[in-house]
Amino acid sequence: MKKLLKQSLLGFALVSMTGAAFADAQSVAELQRRLEQVSQYSADFDQTVRSSKGKQIQSGKGKFQVKRPNLFRMDTKSPQENLIVSDGANLWFYDSFVSQVTVNTVQDAVNNTPFVLLTSSDKSHWDQYDVTQNADTFVLKPKSKKSNLKQFDVRIDQSGMLKGFSTIERDGQSNLYVLRNITGGGVSSDLFKFSVPKGAELDDQRGGKKSKK
């Protein structure tokens, strides 16, 4: 009797795991289908940063531009200028306030920078996240316990119109981005080429080197 009960519980666990994996695969496929419907667009964004207790600690504005596959640019204009650019192979982050550029490979950066997924169909990128769907909201959670990210939410309708996205860090701080003035087409590939500004310090995480232009 005990053996039969043990086998039944094991079978139930396996069925539950298989069902969860199937649901996750369905959610990934649906999110990718929606993202792929719009190949390029440009939008303004409003950013709201909240503490782990829900208190607003900062707000910002900027421009978000995407060109599939694998290209995106997030240009924050206020309250402090900074720039994130994916050129398809590398992810560049420029902090103008401290005049520093950090660069990493997209493959290594995707675990902490899920924005990459908005333009990527690379299975190795998506395999780093568990994905669930609730209507037009998709919740992505990194599988790695080493990630600084706890959760990434994407709000996108069935026509592929991205409404916004948000991140929740391990410490509970959240960043909400709401898109507006969305326009499709006419996004130049030159926007996704990055050159280190003169005088800026370069922190090259691809090889762990630091240099100054």
Swiss-Prot record:
Protein's UniProt keywords contain Protein transport: yes
UniProt-annotated location(s): Periplasm
Superkingdom classification of source: Bacteria
This protein's record includes keyword Ribonucleoprotein: no
A single GO cellular-component term on record: outer membrane-bounded periplasmic space
Gene3D superfamilies: Lipoprotein localisation LolA/LolB/LppX
Keywords, ordered alphabetically: Chaperone, Periplasm, Protein transport, Signal, Transport
Biological processes annotated in GO: lipoprotein localization to outer membrane; lipoprotein transport
Signal peptide segment: 1-23
Family: Belongs to the LolA family.
NCBIfam families: lolA (TIGR00547)
Subunit structure: Monomer.
Function: Participates in the translocation of lipoproteins from the inner membrane to the outer membrane. Only forms a complex with a lipoprotein if the residue after the N-terminal Cys is not an aspartate (The Asp acts as a targeting signal to indicate that the lipoprotein should stay in the inner membrane).
HAMAP family linked to this entry: LolA (MF_00240)
Protein name, entry field: Outer-membrane lipoprotein carrier protein
Organism: Actinobacillus pleuropneumoniae serotype 3 (strain JL03)
